[in-house]
Structures are given as structure tokens and as C-alpha cells.
């Protein structure tokens, strides 16, 4: 796609990984500020599609005790892994694709990769 866009003469082409939230926002701002035609190409396998292909799975995330219930993760993302239990935000590890977007937008840095639970005999 990038080669085609450049071949037709687009002067401002940026390729981003959409799961890198800050860099994606920077690219969008640069495209808006650019005088002329600008194209942003988001290049990443869809997390749900990757899961269906059984590609290497990323570690699921969990909401830690640092969460202050601002709910930015639920209000700003359409992630099916989020749910509310006893007035606390939770992440279903079976639905979490490990994309880490929620962790990047959490104002408390309360969303972290899930720790493996050790089973004792």
C-alpha cells in the first residue's frame, strides 16, 4: 500500500503500528498539520483475526489495585474483554488479546500484563 500511495505522488506518507497509541496520535496530528495530501497507513494484524489464526498469543492484561475507577478504558475503547464486577473494572483473560492499548490510556497505569498464578500442591 505504501508504495502505491507514494507512486501516485502523495508527499506525506506515514506508516504506524496502531497499538502504539502515542505514536499513532503524533502521526495523526502531523497529517492534520501538513499542508497538502497526507496518508496514514496502520499496519498490524487485527488482534481478533490473529487469535482466530492461533498466532503467537500476547500475554493478557489485568486491572490492578491501583485502579481508581476513572473508566477511561471502558469509555474510550470498545474492547469486549472489559466488564464490571462489584463496581470494579475487570478484564476477561480469555477475551483479552494482549494489545496493550488499555494500558497505554490508563491515567493511573493500573493495567498491567497478567501475572501467572502459581499453583501449589
Describe each region flagged by the PLM:
Residues 1-27:
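Conserved thiamine diphosphate
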Residues 16-17, 65, 94:
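Glycine- and other small-residue-rich loops at beta-strand/loop junctions that grip anionic moieties
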Residues 68-92, 97, 101-119:
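Iron-sulfur cluster-binding cysteine motifs and their immediate structural context
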Residues 14-17, 41-42, 113:
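General beta-strand structural signal in soluble alpha/beta enzymes
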Residues 21-24, 47-50, 98, 113:
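Flexible loop/turn segments at secondary-structure boundaries
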Residues 12-14, 37-40, 88:
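Structural motif
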Residues 30-84, 116-117:
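Glycine/aspartate-rich loop-and-adjacent alpha/beta segment that forms the canonical ThDP
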Amino acid at each position: 500500500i505504501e508504495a502505491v500511495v507514494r507512486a501516485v505522488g502523495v508527499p506525506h506518507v506515514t506508516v504506524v503500528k496502531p497499538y502504539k497509541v502515542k505514536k499513532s496520535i503524533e502521526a495523526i496530528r502531523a497529517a492534520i498539520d501538513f499542508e497538502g495530501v497526507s496518508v496514514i497507513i496502520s499496519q498490524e494484524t487485527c488482534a481478533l483475526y490473529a487469535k482466530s489464526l492461533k498466532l503467537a498469543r500476547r500475554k493478557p492484561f489485568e486491572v490492578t489495585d491501583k485502579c481508581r475507577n476513572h473508566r477511561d478504558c471502558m469509555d474510550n475503547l470498545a474492547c469486549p474483554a472489559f466488564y464490571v464486577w462489584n463496581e470494579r473494572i475487570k478484564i476477561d483473560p480469555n477475551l483479552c488479546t494482549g494489545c496493550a492499548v488499555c494500558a497505554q490510556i490508563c491515567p493511573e497505569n493500573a493495567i498491567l500484563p497478567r501475572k501467572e498464578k502459581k499453583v501449589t500442591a
